[in-house]
């Protein structure tokens, strides 16, 4: 399959009569990436699953969600995260989930040094929200399934992970990918906003073209050259 994009919300700041706040799904052959989860996200996800099942005979299973990509910490993009995580726990989810988003280089340094966050850190910075959600039960231990909490200084390509068991923050060698993904990947792209933010790109590996054996013979290619072409 290719990539399927399901836009579940595009409204800014608050819902309107015809639009809901941010939340989208990108489905690929290896799973689903969720981009932002504003207020009421799980209800919109549920409604979209019903629509797809009824009209397209297609199952948009929440168990296939492998990663939640957050673009920034404003609540119209994040307020639905914790309720949704709790609901998946009630559904006995056992698949791992990666939650990843942007922060500032100063916050990354503070987290690694285990010092108080800089005074000018916005209240809506994801570092503050992550720690708040952990206190409210958003950990692997409380939810019953593995959740990785990762923040990054996108421009500097520095990534850290919260170890909710020990309370420590660990620096990662590179931006992590959803577990088990081999043919698809996510990448953060720096953007400009009032707080640390990023866009997310989901890309898929190109499949090799069909090997034209007849044309290879006409060109007089040897066995080694043919094997290389056939392998893509």
Can you describe what each PLM-predicted range is?
Residues 1-232:
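Binuclear metal-dependent hydrolase catalytic cores
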């Amino acid at each position: 399959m290719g990539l399927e994009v399901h836009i579940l919300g595009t409204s800014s700041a608050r819902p309107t009569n015809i639009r809901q706040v941010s939340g989208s799904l990108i489905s690929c052959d290896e799973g689903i990436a969720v981009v932002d989860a504003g207020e009421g996200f799980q209800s919109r996800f549920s409604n979209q699953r019903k629509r797809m099942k009824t009209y397209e005979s297609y199952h948009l299973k929440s168990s296939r969600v492998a990663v939640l990509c957050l673009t920034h910490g404003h609540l119209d993009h994040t307020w639905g995260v914790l309720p949704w995580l709790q609901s998946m726990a009630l559904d006995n989810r056992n698949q791992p989930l990666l939650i990843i988003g942007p922060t500032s280089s100063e916050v990354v340094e503070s987290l690694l040094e285990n010092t108080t966050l800089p005074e000018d850190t916005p209240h809506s910075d994801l570092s503050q929200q992550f720690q708040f959600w952990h206190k409210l039960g958003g950990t692997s231990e409380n939810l019953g399934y593995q959740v990785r909490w990762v923040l990054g200084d996108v421009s500097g390509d520095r990534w850290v992970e919260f170890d909710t068991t020990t309370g420590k923050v660990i620096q990662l060698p590179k931006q992590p990918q959803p577990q088990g993904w081999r043919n698809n990947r996510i990448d953060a792209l720096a953007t400009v906003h009032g707080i640390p933010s990023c866009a997310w790109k989901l890309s898929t590996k190109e499949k090799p073209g069909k090997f034209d054996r007849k044309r290879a013979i006409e060109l007089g290619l040897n066995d080694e050259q043919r094997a290389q072409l056939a392998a893509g």
